[in-house]
Amino acid sequence: MNPLIDVRVQRLPHSDGLPLPRYETSGAAGMDLIAALPEGEPMVLAPGERAMVPTGLAIALPQGFEAQVRPRSGLAAKNGVTVLNSPGTVDCDYRGEVKVILINHGADAFTIERGTRIAQMVVSPVTQARFEEVETLDETARGAGGFGSTGTKGR
């Protein structure tokens, strides 16, 4: 098992009574994020509609880490609902509320209620890059072949 890191969480008033993110199984990579909507005021996503859903949480990640907000596979497979900017990135220096941009690609309206598990959050180490401008790049077998240049058939 990998070592745990400490992430400080600030619960905002509209998330009172909701559970904090947690791993559902011992092998889980992501923790579920929960909709912190007002009780009795569901959000309905019509087909093709998108909305920013509050989680009621702000986090302080350690330096050198990020959190990625990713879709829940069950929501995508069963309802066509996914995270629009997947993965959404929460930087270690961001201190605002974590919100999830959901979009409904399904054929039917999708209702989000208080406590609905809407996305998953994966905390990962970050590697920063330093770009070095050069005149030419090393040659490779692929070269400048772009989208679809390697075909679709298995080898």
From Swiss-Prot:
- Keyword Hydrolase present in the record's keywords: the answer is yes
Q: What class of enzyme is it?
A: hydrolase
Instruction: List the pathway annotation.
Output: Pyrimidine metabolism; dUMP biosynthesis; dUMP from dCTP (dUTP route): step 2/2
Q: Which residues bind substrate?
A: R72, S73, G74, N85, T89, V90, D91, K99
Q: A Gene Ontology biological process annotation?
A: dUTP catabolic process
The record's keywords, sorted A to Z, are:
Hydrolase, Magnesium, Metal-binding, Nucleotide metabolism
Q: Which reaction does it catalyse?
A: dUTP + H2O = dUMP + diphosphate + H(+)
What is this protein's function per UniProt? This enzyme is involved in nucleotide metabolism: it produces dUMP, the immediate precursor of thymidine nucleotides and it decreases the intracellular concentration of dUTP so that uracil cannot be incorporated into DNA.
Question: What is the protein name stated in its UniProt record?
Answer: Deoxyuridine 5'-triphosphate nucleotidohydrolase
Instruction: State which gene encodes it.
Output: dut
